Regions:
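Terminal, low-complexity interaction segments
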Residues: 120, 124-186, 265
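Extended extracellular/luminal ectodomain segments enriched in beta-structured repeat modules
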Residues: 87-96, 148
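Short, surface-exposed alpha-helix to beta-strand junction/turn motifs within ectodomains of secreted
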Residues: 209-240, 268
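Sequence-level preference for short, compositionally simple segments enriched
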Residues: 289-639, 646-652, 658-698
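Surface-exposed, low-complexity/disordered Ser/Thr/Gly/Pro/Asn-rich loops and linkers
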Residues: 37-89
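Acidic, Ser/Thr/Gly/Pro-rich low-complexity segments and short DxT(G/T)-type signature motifs
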Residues: 188-201, 253-254, 264-289
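Extended, low-complexity, turn-rich repeat/linker tracts enriched in Gly/Pro/Ser/Thr and Asp/Glu
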Residues: 89-91, 100-107
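C-terminal outer-membrane/trafficking sorting elements
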Residues: 655, 701-753
Length: 753
């Protein structure tokens, strides 16, 4: 047995091969800045290959130890393992591990190091003494490799050594656990971080009223203790990820110039070299016309079922006017068709489970994304399909949950989940089949396994902002131009492909500032970003992606002999902000079609929402922008009041059990049955499409105040029980709000006869 004991600070990176995994295996242990490190197997031409997984969990190891076995059937000794680590914070670097073989192998393997991936230095040789015998090794690297920001290591056959085995080309060389260690020691260059870029740009007049200031530096940074930014008189808390610092802000005013400031010395590198100049950025949120206030047209379940809501929207006479459907928290099932059927793969007829939207301008608004779950009813009949068990209505256009037809343009979804009823691994279980144009999804979730979302209009434009798209196989696929802004892509299980774009309108699938996560850790290093569904037309571009679960090193996959117009990335990073190595990304599709998998900075910057979707002035980001949060919220007994806002369509008033009611006035009387002094109540503002934003809370007062005998009210205002102001002298049950000279207000509920 061979045992190594290290302090956590010694590790640069390591693979113990305990958990399953082969082909572009992420490091099992790593130091800061090495969370993007992978171990790969290459052939003599540098192409990536897989290996036989001999991990402890997958195979019980190889001859008593976990490892990775080559097991290729051609080119004995032509394949080699390689990795690249960031050793910029380490000196006295060493690599240790073990190797063995079975069946056939060269008996000596060299361990080599390189600073550029071209010129290699042999640091030691592993001479294996017979089949099925582990040989341990430890090699110290020369000082020239100290503090190397890019240090490559490879394990390659010494073809001058003897071979052992049956004489065939089947290679049984096995790599055991690897530990790359060093002595932590940063190199202090004495230079402060340099600000390379920032958002919004200086002088920008198109910023959001709620967003974030983004500062990008030339090296990894940290904030000085207590350092904060300042904007509109408010202190902004920083968030640091690698080389980037962000400052979230909210509730700015449209069309008003602001200046963000950050004092000198607030940002420093990891050796405490601090910036010497203050940062100042002037920008102006875009202008926006005031919006008309209106209540929801249909509330589910208050006004009826989900089927009733869709029927009402479809039956309205004026389809140019937006119809807003609101769903309280709950689970809802679209009804089966009463007169249409679909033929299952078993040849039988089943009631059509798909709901069809044929009219434009409908908003589907939920109380909360997790709280509102909408699905359909599919038969629970499973057959043996081409790729395993499959629902009889699997397939595009058969068991879809929701289908937007060509005329259903301008539909809007927010704060809800559309979910497949088929279950995982039951074939193509489409949640949204979109044949329309200008659909917007904001902070919503599409939940399925394969072909979750199908953009089905070559001339269509579609926009996603925030929210979750979940699946395993081609779970965003199809035609047209789709802009995914800050969406969380959730990868299910092992393997799979996120996207399968086909024919674009012009720009294809653009993923900007998105995040990729695994439903479990099994996804890490085992999926790809997409594959081309077509010949020479598919486009998928990932820009500024945070890959909490990393794809395979090659990044992309083949599909039915197709090839892309472009499948590429820019600035893909790990959760810690470590840049992901894109040099191994797939460059050839269908054997002969070249692909440049890396975007330039200028290319990436061009793909804005405006450039991709705004040819006719369509601005989905402004449409989806959340209404300003409520300000001035106060409680006067049963009555809540707050500042009016002309960019809010309505307000939702919330109690401890959810939404109590809605209003288009900046006040609301809580019904007696829902009121309790001391409880917390909240108000949420809706944007022009009806989507609700964050809740602002207040603690309710009793409404009974002591008033001294010599105090006189300077103002008295009367309201009815609906919170609408009425004239003095009105009859009925009224709310009297008195304001006194000292600023106090007293609210009294009274009966006026």
């Amino acid at each position: 047995e061979y045992t190594g004991i290290f302090s956590p600070g010694d590790f640069i990176t390591a693979w113990d091969f305990y958990l399953p995994g082969a082909s572009s295996r992420p490091a099992d242990f790593y130091a800061e800045d090495n969370d993007a490190t992978v171990l790969i197997l290459r052939d003599a031409q540098g192409n990536l290959s897989s290996w036989l997984d001999k991990s402890e969990q997958a195979a019980g190891g190889f001859e008593g130890r976990p490892g990775a076995t080559n097991w290729t059937t051609a080119g004995l000794g032509s394949y080699y393992w390689q990795t690249t680590v960031n050793a910029s914070a380490f000196t006295a670097i060493s690599v240790e591990g073990a190797m063995a073989y079975n069946f056939n192998a060269y008996t000596t393997y060299d361990v080599e190091a390189s600073l550029d991936g071209t010129e290699w230095t042999k640091i030691g040789s592993v001479k294996i003494e017979g089949a099925k015998k582990w040989k341990d090794y430890r090699f110290d690297l020369p000082a020239k490799f100290d503090n190397a920001p890019s240090l490559s290591l490879r394990w390659i056959a010494d073809k001058s050594s003897a071979t052992d085995g049956s004489g065939s080309e089947k290679d049984g060389i096995t790599l055991g656990a690897i530990y790359i260690t060093g002595t932590p020691k940063l190199v202090n260059d004495g230079t402060a971080p340099v600000l390379l870029s920032y958002v919004p740009a200086e002088g920008s007049d198109n910023a959001s009223i709620t967003g974030k200031i983004v500062l990008n530096f030339d090296e990894k940074v940290k904030m000085a203790a207590g350092a904060k930014g300042e904007l509109a008189g408010a202190k902004l808390e920083p968030a640091v990820t690698g080389k980037t610092v962000t400052f979230p802000y909210k509730n700015l005013a449209y069309g008003t110039e602001y200046t963000f400031t950050l004092p000198a010395g607030a940002v420093m590198d990891l050796c405490d070299n601090a910036t010497t100049q203050a940062i100042s950025i002037k920008f102006t949120p875009r202008t926006k016309p005031e919006i008309e206030k209106a209540l929801y047209d249909f509330i589910v379940p208050d006004d009826g079922t989900i089927g009733d809501a869709v029927a009402a929207a479809e039956a309205r006479e004026d389809v140019t006017k937006r119809f807003r459907i609101f769903f309280r928290n709950g689970s809802y099932v679209f009804p089966l068709s009463a007169d249409k059927t679909k033929t299952g793969s078993d040849g039988k007829e089943y009631a059509d489970p798909t709901t069809y939207i044929t009219t434009p301008n409908i908003s589907f608004i939920g109380e909360s994304t997790k709280g509102v779950v909408i699905t359909n009813a599919v038969p629970g009949v499973v057959i043996d399909g081409q790729y395993g068990p499959a629902n009889v209505l699997e397939g595009i256009g058969k068991g879809d949950v929701l289908r937007l037809e060509k005329k259903a343009t301008g539909c809007y979804f927010q704060n809800l989940t559309l979910k497949s009823a088929m279950g995982d691994s039951r074939g193509r279980d489409i949640v949204l089949n979109d044949n329309s144009d200008k659909t917007i999804f904001k902070d919503a979730c599409l939940w399925a396994y394969q072909d979750t979302y199908v953009s089905n209009n070559e001339n269509g434009r579609f926009y996603f902002e925030g929210g979750v798209l979940r699946g395993r196989t081609d779970y965003v696929c199809g035609k047209g131009d789709v802009y995914y802004q800050a969406v969380n892509f959730q990868v299910v299980g092992e393997g799979g492909y996120i996207s399968a774009p086909s024919k674009p309108k012009q720009y294809g699938y653009i993923f900007n500032e998105c995040e990729i996560t695994g439903e479990t850790s099994a996804a890490n290093g085992k999926y790809t970003l997409g594959r081309p569904w077509g010949s020479g037309t598919p486009i998928a571009l990932y820009i500024n992606t945070v890959m909490k679960a990393q794809p395979k090193a090659e990044g992309w996959n083949e599909m039915s002999g197709g090839w892309p117009a472009r499948m590429a990335e820019y600035n893909s990073v790990t959760a810690a902000g470590t840049p992901i190595d894109l040099s191994k990304r797939k460059k050839i599709f269908a054997q002969t079609h070249e692909n440049n998998p890396v975007l330039t900075k200028s290319e990436a910057e061009w793909y804005t929402i405006e450039n991709v979707l705004g040819q006719d002035g369509w601005d989905p980001a402004m449409t989806a922008e959340q209404a300003p949060e409520v300000t001035g919220l106060k409680s006067e007994g049963y009555v809540l009041s707050w500042d009016n806002n002309n960019y809010t369509s309505l307000w939702a008033v919330c109690g401890k059990n959810g939404i109590i009611g809605f209003t288009t006035e900046p006040k609301f009387e809580i019904p007696a049955a829902d009121f309790k002094a001391g409880d917390t109540y909240g108000v949420r503002a809706a944007n022009e499409m009806g989507g609700l934003g964050a809740q602002v809370d207040v603690t309710a007062e009793s409404g009974i105040s002591s008033v001294t005998a010599d105090s006189e009210a300077v103002s008295t205002v009367w309201y009815n029980l609906q919170g609408i102001r009425v004239a003095e002298g009105a009859k009925g049950i009224l709310i009297k709000v008195e304001t006194f000279a000292d600023g106090r207000t007293v609210t009294t509920k009274t009966v006026v006869e």
